[in-house]
Amino acid sequence: MLQPKRTKFRKAHKGRIHGNAPGGATLNFGAYGLKAMEPDRITARQIEAARRAITRHIRRQGRLWIRIFPDVPVSSKPAEVRMGSGKGSPEFWVARVKPGRILFELDGVPGPIARVAFERAAAKLPIKVKVVARLGETIYEEA
């Protein structure tokens, strides 16, 4: 799973996610992408589950880019512990995602396969997402 090798601080404030994605909102690598439509925190486990869903569906063809990284630690206290006596220890890592952010990119696969792969990945994520394509690419089968 993804997590930073080292950080400046061990714990982080919870904070709020405001506004739209300032960067990372356009396709930079692949022909197809999965774009976030709402703000949320996506855990490293969710990113890994989505990655596995995509790679299983495309079956070793094409190339996948993960455009988000879980760099924020989330701390929690153990069960049945009284309040107070400091902040809990870091339990897992999350990526703060704003609307418009590209989460994954794919290239080297046909559009319909990319669309189904992203739909399977979307089922693993806690937010609404949209499949986007570079200009000139098709993501739906022509009847």
Curated annotation (Swiss-Prot):
CDD domains: Ribosomal_L16_L10e
Keyword Protease recorded: no
Function: Binds 23S rRNA and is also seen to make contacts with the A and possibly P site tRNAs.
Upper lineage: Bacteria, Pseudomonadati, Pseudomonadota, Alphaproteobacteria, Sphingomonadales
Biological-process GO terms, alphabetical: translation
Quaternary structure and partners: Part of the 50S ribosomal subunit.
Annotated keywords: Ribonucleoprotein, Ribosomal protein, RNA-binding, rRNA-binding, tRNA-binding
UniProt cross-references to Pfam families, sorted A to Z: Ribosomal_L16 (PF00252)
UniProt-recorded Gene Ontology molecular function terms: rRNA binding; structural constituent of ribosome; tRNA binding
UniProt family annotation: Belongs to the universal ribosomal protein uL16 family.
Gene assigned in the entry: rplP
Protein name (Swiss-Prot/TrEMBL): Large ribosomal subunit protein uL16
Disordered, as annotated region: 1-20
GO CC term, one of those recorded: cytosolic large ribosomal subunit
Record Gene3D superfamilies: Ribosomal protein L10e/L16
InterPro entries hit by this protein: Ribosomal_uL16 (IPR047873), Ribosomal_uL16_bact-type (IPR000114), Ribosomal_uL16_CS (IPR020798), Ribosomal_uL16_dom (IPR016180), Ribosomal_uL16_sf (IPR036920)
